Curated annotation (Swiss-Prot):
Gene name for this UniProt entry: srb8
Cellular component per GO, a single term: mediator complex
Disulfide bonds: none
Name of the protein this chain belongs to: Mediator of RNA polymerase II transcription subunit 12
Keyword hit for Transcription regulation: yes
Complexes and interactors: Component of the srb8-11 complex, which itself associates with the Mediator complex.
Gene Ontology MF: a single term: transcription coregulator activity
Length: 1582
């Protein structure tokens, strides 16, 4: 008995057999470095756990002949085999012809964790990795591979094998290693012979000077000669030759024919040798037959199959019948049959089943169908088997069973024993429907099929969507602790998809849904991740269809800049906005022009725009922008003066001149060079043009004398009176001096009163007068020694003049001087003025300084005890608008509360008991006694306070009347009474106002409430809320008398007052009006909407009465102001009020007409109005044009009017597109879907009517293709319109578009073929005209190909509609033609690589490319075309894809060079080489050498039409001299072909079911499924 001391070791005395089964020869050199000659079915499978009931196997034989031999003693173990030597692919591995060896030590252990691959324990990828690779491995390699480092100290030296078993240490270590964790390193390995690295290699994988001892060498045989003389490795020969061939050879060489004769002799010898070694025996391969066995014999046979020591040749004699399908796999699992032997059984059963199907069939088609059906049924059985194992999760030995089932299924898959399409479809469906608990199991299996599944788009895209769906489902549950590992694993898979299989994430229908999810899986800090994601996002964006109108109306750069301008009013951040504007628009001239237009347009309001523009221009001037040139250019080219307030533009320039930012001398030089021009006004003779008119607006106060003289000279040349400007300034100064005699010296003058309207005076005049006023105020304040240098009246007058001028910068200087006064009224007025002009002064940068100055004056007056409540109120209101001054406002409120509490706690005076009886508002001493009472510092009781309030409210009701106190003073006294008892005062005022509302003879509420609002006792908002509350209850109680009159009172309360005097109370009321309009625009619109119906003729006489006669006109102006102030909110409100509000619609139309510069009284036809509105739209007027069109569309208009509007809109769309504008899109969005569809269809008709290529382009004698350039530009316009209106395309698509697109692509392909032929014919010519013609053609080709691809994307749905039964063939033909055209054009290799350029609508190569020309970075046009093809293939049926593949292979010879291009294989796969082409059903196709007669996809013929040799040559020209590829490129599909008379009969169909080893009991010479005679195989003799 041989001791089993080295389980798993190689028998040292066992000779290795060669391939020919020649056991008599013991050539051991074949055991080393033998190449892998086994089939894929014999590849390595990891060792599987032994079933608990299975006995241990000790037999180490590998064949039937060796199984009968006795086992010699085991060889001594060799220690310290390093990991490198065992992992080395050149390490010796025994070659076998049967099944792999499985040792008992491994059979008793659990599956190895395969830690050397660095994969987690749960990954099945390592278990089938050897199946995927081409290297051969055995189970012994799996034992050797996990070895670790060299042990620190070697174990004791082992005893000889014949003296007993080795030390217990080795056996115990081996046992422990097999039972321990899989990651633990094995300490010892069996002895293996190593080939020295320096040994020279010989032919036949032999090694020289190296013969390892195997026990039966000749020197081991003891004979008499060996004992006496020793052993010699070569036979001794005598030193002298017995005979020589020299004489005979010399005699032959002397003749001329000697060499030829010798050559013939040697050739005859070689031929005989070749014929002798050639295998001529026919193939004797037959699948092993199946026999019927009893159950016991069947179980015994299966147990023998599970035993690796039983050779397969012996088992092949008695394969039991009745084991098939899922039952076969269950038997393999229950018996733990090794995977490679289980696959052998599957092949045997499958081969017999398929042959049985062939015997039943009568025709070729029926046989193929039966075989396919059987394979699909078998695949279903495998799926059921795997589902059963997965469903048993959690049971005993589930992990081992899952490992076996996964390994066996993967082996079947990679052996091509399954229907891959069906298997992958089931796999993806199962993964998609799996619960989150089972997803990890499917992910482990996914690692096995990862590369195979992502080889084709059909599976890769669906896998990507399934993984993204599972990740979305995981993140939605919000269980970070439990699902975080799963989410990380899914993210890792998705990231690997993005980085390695980017094209699988081209998702035409779900990109927007999964975009953020994909982004979350990447590390955007990594350059690779960011670059690939940007490219992926761009590729997806180019094949997306706009799903809504908002997608089609994206904001342009001009609109973004305008939005930034509008945001300054709220943010007040000039620095960041300046940088943002420069970054948003690269064209600096356009940026400056847009800023000037924004500041002057009538569709915006506010004086702050002037100072915003001035500050931005100063910032840009510092940044290096040439604002002088751009401003002058704007003035010389401005045309739409009706919608621009040019006074604002001149104001901006005057501010720039004051700050020396604008160069006056440069402007004068430009004007001299240009010449002063006049512009006809049509009525009043001639006026100066806008650029020359600036000459009259320039302030000259700080300019040198020679510049002033030059300006006067140019004014004289322009016909402008020079004396008129100086006289106007003199008259203004004189008039102001008369009104302010204390500040300015009054001179005797006969000058009349000058109108201070800013439209009547130039900025040269206003600037001169304003600076004179500022200088006078400053001088007056410095010279005076009085407490208050300015009186309130003087301050009001100065403020009124500067406000009429609109010169806020000078006003800010005057306010800064007025802060030094000690008059509370002036300081309160200064605070109110800053608050009123808050936006403009903030843009100037003076708001914070003025507020701090006012706070300083407040502190000064507080210390002196001369503080007034008016000043405190105004200062607090101003501080509330400054976010940085919240602390100061808090202190001011504390002081105000302290004052009010002090007044409330003061004791009433004893004299006040008699006051109510003696107080009378008619009394002359009423005001004096009231001021004495308020200033005495004593308190007031409620009765006294009530008497005073009653007297003051009576004065307020009568409007002053006979009382000595005015209504404004009465309201001021009411405000002074508030600190004594605020609650009582508010109650009295509420009762007073409520009494007025109930009174039928109440006065006009605007006269009563204006002063109350001015002093702060009542607010407009609180009064409106009170009226609304009472109106809600008035329906039942009648609380308000004459509510219609009250509505008009409220509206009149919001209108600007006519009085010109602006004292403190009036000015505060204006401030309150401004605040209400800004904060409550919706309430204002409701007030206007309620009051407008009362303007009708029925109510006019009764309601207006003594009111303002211009109330309707003022209402229109108020509504226009609201539209300009808050356009977005007001426009939205107006859109909602269009239906059912005829009166409001009428007033709104007038306000919009005023904004648009139209005449409200002009009664034009709706169609004419619509045409005029459409043509005047721009970046600023767009929302108002939309509103005007909406008003027109709501009017009763017939179909003729609507059709006319559609015509006008289409013309406007073409005009705007030509001008690079997109305003028309917003106007079309107001129209219904039908109108947008009509406009789009007109654009499509015009697009398809444009000639793609003119005849002049085909003539190489012409220098350029100017006509083509114009056609390209026209096509661009129509394509832009189609893209913008893509939302009007129905979901079902437009069925008339696909045929047009297919025909256009065919025409494009035909032109490309003709151009290639012409290029080949004139290749020798290198004239300039030829080069330009080629470039023009390629430029046109790039555009039309890109444009047609875009239309295909937009109308993709039309290709996907399932056709009717009668048109199914035509639809399939169109789909195939479309794919063929796209692939052939994208495949074309043009001289200038035009198809590799960026497919942007606004980028095309120059006519003559510069020397340093480089393509624009981005997505290549070729890549974009393939992405479009991928999006089509996703929705096309498989039949269209298969027809496209068949067509390109059979009828497109140039495409044969690119069949193995990974991109096309990815798109059109899976493509089976065994599929019989349609042309082979009747006759064999031509060989590649005979491609001249093969038909090609010319556009004129359909896929089933006729073809010509000329067309073939044309198609072959696509890849002619410019392809750069060899014509003899070998294809994978053509490597196995049957040659018959020089013709190829097609690829030989290799059947994986017949790739069986050990199929026959006796090994024959030609025992192979593929007959060796077909390949002229020869015997290889060692």
């Amino acid at each position: 008995m041989i001791p089993n001391s080295s389980a798993g070791g190689q028998s040292w005395g066992h000779p290795l057999r060669n391939v020919d089964n020649d056991t008599a020869r013991g050539d051991t050199s074949q055991a080393f470095n033998r190449p892998d000659i086994r089939s894929e079915g014999q590849q390595y499978t990891p060792a599987l756990p032994r079933h608990p009931g299975q006995p241990a196997v000790i037999d180490l034989t590998s064949s039937a002949n060796d199984a009968q031999e006795g086992q010699p003693p085991a060889k001594r173990l060799k220690l310290d085999i390093t990991a490198e030597s065992s992992a080395n692919p050149a390490s010796p591995t025994p070659a076998t012809t049967g099944d792999s060896r499985v040792t008992p030590g491994i059979a008793n252990s659990k599956p190895s964790a395969l830690s050397w691959r660095g994969r987690p324990v749960w990954s099945f990828q390592a278990m089938i990795s050897e199946v995927m690779s081409g290297a051969e491995a055995t189970e012994e390699d799996a034992i050797l591979a996990p070895q670790g480092k060299r042990p620190a100290s070697p174990p004791p030296f082992p005893q000889p094998s014949w003296k007993g078993a080795p030390p217990e240490q080795f056996g115990s270590n081996a046992t422990k290693a097999s039972e321990s964790d899989s990651s633990k390193k094995v300490q010892t390995t069996p002895f293996r012979v190593e080939v020295p690295s320096i040994a020279p290699a010989l032919k036949g994988d032999k090694v020289a000077d190296f013969a390892p001892w195997i026990g039966n060498h000749p020197e081991d045989i003891l004979s008499e000669q060996t004992v006496k003389q020793g052993h010699y490795d070569r036979t001794q020969v005598s030193q002298n030759e017995s005979n020589t061939a020299r004489p005979s050879l010399y005699a032959q060489l002397k003749h001329r024919s000697g060499l030829q004769m010798l050559s013939s002799v040697f050739m005859a010898a070689l031929e005989k040798r070749q014929n002798h070694n050639t295998i001529n025996v026919p193939s004797n391969f037959k699948p092993p037959p199946r026999v019927t066995l009893t159950d016991n014999k069947r179980e015994a046979w299966l147990r023998d199959l599970a035993n690796p020591s039983v050779p397969l040749r012996r088992l092949s004699r008695t394969i039991p019948h009745g084991i098939r399908g899922k039952n076969l796999l269950d038997q393999c699992l229950s018996k733990w049959i090794p995977v490679n032997r289980a696959v052998w059984l599957v092949k045997c059963v499958g081969a017999n089943e398929i042959r049985a199907c062939k015997r039943k069939g009568t025709g070729g088609t029926l046989v193929v169908g039966s075989e396919v059906k059987w394979v699909r049924d078998w695949t279903s059985g495998v799926q059921q088997f795997l589902e059963g194992v997965i469903g048993a999760c959690g049971s005993a030995d589930w992990k081992s069973k899952m490992t076996y089932a996964t390994s066996l299924t993967a082996r079947l898959f990679f052996e091509r024993l399954l229907d891959h399409d069906q298997y992958f479809a089931w796999f993806l469906t199962s993964l998609e429907g799996a619960s989150l608990n089972m997803v990890p199991v499917w992910l482990l299996m996914l690692g096995i099929y990862w590369d195979s599944m992502l080889r084709y788009r059909k599976r890769g895209r669906r896998l990507a969507e399934v993984l993204l769906g599972k990740l979305h489902q995981t993140t939605e549950l919000q269980r970070p602790t439990l699902l975080q590992p799963l989410a990380e694993r899914l993210s890792c898979c998705i990231r690997k998809l993005v980085l390695e299989h980017t094209s699988s994430l081209i998702l035409p229908n779900s990109w927007e849904t999964h975009r953020d999810l994909i982004l979350s899986c990447l590390n955007m800090k990594e350059t690779a991740d960011k670059t690939i994601f940007d490219s992926l996002a761009e590729r997806n964006s180019r094949i997306q269809l706009p799903s809504s109108r908002s997608d089609s109306t994206r904001q342009s750069a001009h609109q973004r800049v305008i939005q930034l301008f509008d945001s300054i009013q709220s943010s007040q951040d000039i620095a960041s906005t300046s940088v943002a504007c420069l970054n948003a628009l690269e064209d600096r001239q356009t940026l400056v022009i847009k800023l000037l237009e924004w500041s002057a347009t009538s569709f915006r309001s506010g004086l702050h725009r002037v100072y915003t523009a001035a500050r931005l221009l100063r910032k840009w001037k510092i940044s290096g922008v040439d604002i002088d040139t751009y401003i002058i250019s704007f003035l010389s080219t401005v045309q739409d003066l009706a919608q621009l307030d040019m006074d604002n533009v001149y104001h901006i320039i005057s501010e720039l001149v004051r700050s020396q930012t604008f160069s006056v001398s440069r402007y004068l030089q430009w004007l001299m060079a240009k010449g002063v021009a006049r512009k006809s006004s049509g009525t009043s003779g001639e006026v100066l043009a806008a650029d020359a008119r600036l000459l009259t607006q320039l302030p000259m106060s700080r300019s040198p004398e020679h510049v002033r003289n030059l300006r006067l000279t140019l004014l004289a040349r322009a016909g402008v009176s020079v004396d008129e400007e100086s006289s106007t300034i003199k008259c203004l100064k004189s008039s102001i001096s008369q009104r302010l005699p204390n500040i300015f010296e009054v001179e005797a003058s006969n000058s009349k009163h000058i109108n201070f309207s800013k439209h009547d005076l130039t900025w040269a005049v206003k600037s001169e007068v304003s600076m004179w006023i500022r200088q006078g105020v400053v001088k007056h304040l410095k010279d005076t020694t009085r407490i208050s240098a300015l009186t309130p009246g003087e301050f009001y007058c100065v403020r009124e003049i500067l406000e009429r001028f609109g010169d806020c910068s000078i006003l800010a200087d005057v306010l800064k001087q007025a802060i030094e006064c000690d008059d509370n009224i002036i300081l309160a007025s200064v605070s109110d003025t800053v608050n009123y002009h808050f936006d403009a002064l903030s843009m100037i940068g003076a708001t914070s300084d003025l507020f701090r100055g006012l706070v300083g004056s407040y502190a000064r007056l507080k210390r002196s005890g001369n503080l007034s409540l008016d000043f405190v109120f105004s200062l607090i209101e101003l501080g509330l608008r400054l976010p940085d001054e919240s602390g100061t406002v808090y202190l001011l409120r504390q002081d105000l509360a302290r004052i009010e509490s002090k007044s409330a706690l003061a004791a009433p005076s004893p004299l006040s008991d008699h006051i109510p009886t003696t107080f009378n508002e008619v009394d002359a001493s009423f005001q004096e006694r009231l001021e004495q009472l308020l200033s005495c510092g004593n308190g007031l009781d409620e009765s006294t306070m009530g008497a005073i309030i009653s007297s003051l409210t009576k004065i307020l009701t009568d409007g002053g009347g006979a009382a000595k106190v005015s209504a404004k003073d009465a309201c001021r006294y009411l405000a002074y009474l508030r600190p004594f008892n605020p609650k009582y005062l508010d109650g009295m005022l509420v009762r007073y106002v409520y009494g007025l509302l109930k009174s039928s003879s109440r006065p006009t509420m605007s006269q009563v409430l204006s002063p109350l609002i001015g002093v702060g006792c009542v607010t407009i908002h609180s009064f409106v809320l009170l009226v609304n509350k009472l109106s809600a209850s008035a329906q039942t109680t009648g609380a308000i008398a004459n509510p219609d009159s009250l509505r008009l009172d409220i509206l009149e309360l919001l209108l600007p007052q006519e009085e010109s005097s602006a004292d403190m109370v009036t000015y505060r009321f204006r401030l309150a009006q401004q605040e209400f309009l800004v904060k409550y625009p919706e309430e204002t619109l409701n007030i206007i909407s309620d009051a407008i119906p009362l303007f009708d003729a029925d109510f006019h006489d009764a309601n207006l009465g003594s009111r303002r006669p211009d109330l309707p006109a003022c209402t229109v102006v108020l509504l226009r102001t609201l539209l300009a102030q808050n356009s977005s909110l007001v426009l939205k409100y107006c859109m909602q009020k269009l239906d059912g509000h005829s009166s409001f619609t009428t007033v709104l139309g007038k306000a919009v007409d005023i904004l648009l510069g139209l005449d409200p009284e002009d009664e034009m036809e709706p169609s004419s109005q619509a045409e005029r509105v459409i043509l005047m739209n721009n970046d600023f007027s767009l929302p108002y044009c939309q509103l005007k069109l909406k008003l027109l569309f709501n009017a009763k208009a017939g179909n003729e009017v609507k059709n006319h509007i559609v015509d006008v809109m289409f013309k406007a769309a073409v005009t705007d597109s030509r001008s690079k504008r997109s305003h028309w899109v917003g106007l079309v969005s107001l129209m219904d879907q039908e109108a947008a569809r009509q406009i789009r269809e007109r654009a499509e008709g015009c697009f398809f009517s444009v000639a793609m290529f003119d005849e002049s382009m085909d003539d190489t004698s012409l220098p350029s293709g100017a006509s083509s350039l114009s056609s390209i530009e026209s096509a661009k316009l129509y394509l832009n319109i189609i893209e913008k209106l893509a939302y009007s395309i129905p979901q079902a698509g437009v069925q008339s578009i696909p045929p047009l697109l297919v025909e256009r692509l065919d025409l494009l392909l035909q032109k490309l073929i003709i151009m290639q032929i012409n290029s080949n014919s004139v290749a020798a010519s290198s004239s300039g005209s030829t080069i330009v013609s080629k470039i023009n053609f390629e430029r046109a080709l790039a555009f039309w190909f890109s444009a047609l691809l875009r239309l295909i994307v937009l109308h993709r749905a039309a290709f996907n509609v399932p056709p009717a039964s009668g048109s199914k063939v035509d639809s399939l033909r169109e789909q195939t033609r479309l794919l063929v055209s796209i692939l052939c054009i994208s495949l074309a290799r043009l001289p200038e690589n035009i198809l590799r350029l960026f497919p942007a609508a606004d980028y095309f190569p120059h006519t003559i490319q510069s020397h340093n020309f480089r393509p624009c970075p981005g997505i290549l046009l070729q890549t974009h075309a393939l992405d479009v093809a991928a999006s089509l293939i996703d929705s096309f049926p498989d039949e269209a894809r298969h027809q496209c593949v068949r067509f390109l292979r059979e009828r497109c010879p140039p495409f044969l060079k690119f069949q193995n291009d990974r991109r096309f294989l990815y798109l059109l796969g899976p493509m089976t080489d065994t599929t019989i082409p349609s042309s082979q059903l009747s006759a064999s196709i031509s060989s590649p050498a005979a491609g001249g007669s093969t038909p090609t996809p010319i556009p004129s013929g359909t896929l089933s039409g006729g073809h010509s040799s000329q067309a073939t040559q044309q198609m072959a020209a696509l890849t002619g001299p410019f392809s750069g590829l060899s014509e003899n490129t070998k294809l994978v599909a053509d490597r196995l072909r049957i040659q018959n008379g020089g013709r190829i009969n097609g690829p030989y169909p290799v059947r994986p079911w017949e790739l069986l080893e050990d199929a026959a009991p006796i090994l024959g010479v030609n025992d192979t499924a593929v007959s060796l005679k077909l390949f002229d195989a020869r015997r290889v003799r060692a």
